[in-house]
Amino acid sequence: MIEPFERKIWLSSPTMHGDEMKYVAEAYETNWMSTVGKNIDETERLLAERVGVRYAVALSAGTASLHLAVKLAGEAMYGQAVIGKGSLSGKKVFCSDVTFGATVNPVVYEGGIPVFIDTERETWKIGRAHV
């Protein structure tokens, strides 16, 4: 029989700094419970300013960010996707064999074909000899 762990090891726990409830209440009271609003607009503006670009986009999760990056990379390489098809439609995309689903799923969502490449034991990078 497998014994359960005494303590849970969190993959990632939230970090709170004290003002979160104030901002949640403000969003609720002003009916800005959405992907837009002054807090998001200001976050995007500050981020763009900090990294020295004209625009930045705040997304709901890292997975959404990876999907957007894959979509834009596909469009930059192959042009705008046909309606109903992904930006990587039918294209093979090299992916590490040691990964998390969020890094491969956007390739599939965009119609690409993931090709898993062995990872080098010492560096955890895709092995050049395997490409």
Put a short name on every predicted segment.
Residues M1-S34:
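N-terminal "arm"/small-domain region of PLP-dependent enzymes with the aminotransferase-like
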Residues L59, T63, G101, K125:
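Glycine-rich phosphate-binding loop at the start of an alpha helix
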Residues V36-K92, P106-E110, F116-D118:
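Phosphate-binding glycine-rich loop
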Residues A129-V131:
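Conserved small/polar residues in nucleotide/adenosyl-binding loops
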